[in-house]
Amino acid sequence: EGIVKKVRSMGFYVGANYIFGLPDDTLDSMKETLDLSLRINSEWVNFYSAMAYPGSQLHVIAKKKSWKLPEDKMNPGWIGYSQHAYECLPLRTEKLKATEVLDFRDKAFLTYFKSNDYLSMTKSTFGADTVDHIQKMTSHKLSRKHHKEIVDY
């Protein structure tokens, strides 16, 4: 957090990236990550669910643990690696199903971009038109396969 203050004091805007669903993540640890993002209150943020891309160390771990992967038979294929896809299939954790990680990511996105502190900072930094755009953006909810169909992940 101190680094962010230092960077801002030099006149830079801050964009931050956060990943939910690493192998040892729990709901509590993901909440801590979200809380950190809210304290930092950066000008832009990206929230990702961890993905075990082929060739990555996470893919090796997922294979060893027999965790479901997008390319597995009966799963969505490569589209499952797309963060915003209907068929998104992120990495599960030791404690959470992939669908729980994805739901947390989606809720975290809305929590952040609807927070009063973020909207107030955005208005004073970028103006009311930007806040209007963000409010329109957050009025749309991502459609996810596991909300409409029974899935086993």
Describe the residue ranges of each PLM region:
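Low-complexity, compositionally biased segments
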Residues: D28, E32, L38, F109, ...
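Conserved, mostly hydrophobic/aromatic
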Residues: A16, S37, G55, A108
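Short, intrinsically disordered, charge-balanced linker/junction segments flanking boundaries
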Residues: E1-K5, G11, Y81, I150-Y153
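A general structural detector for well-ordered alpha-helical segments in enzyme core domains, enriched
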Residues: G2-K6, S29-L36, F104
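Conserved strand-turn element in the central/C-terminal portion of the radical SAM core barrel
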Residues: V4-S29, W44, Y48-P54, E87-A98
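Hydrophobic alpha-helix feature that most strongly marks membrane-spanning transmembrane helices
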Residues: K5-R8, F12, D35-L38, A52, ...
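Radical SAM enzyme core and accessory elements
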Residues: Q57-Y153
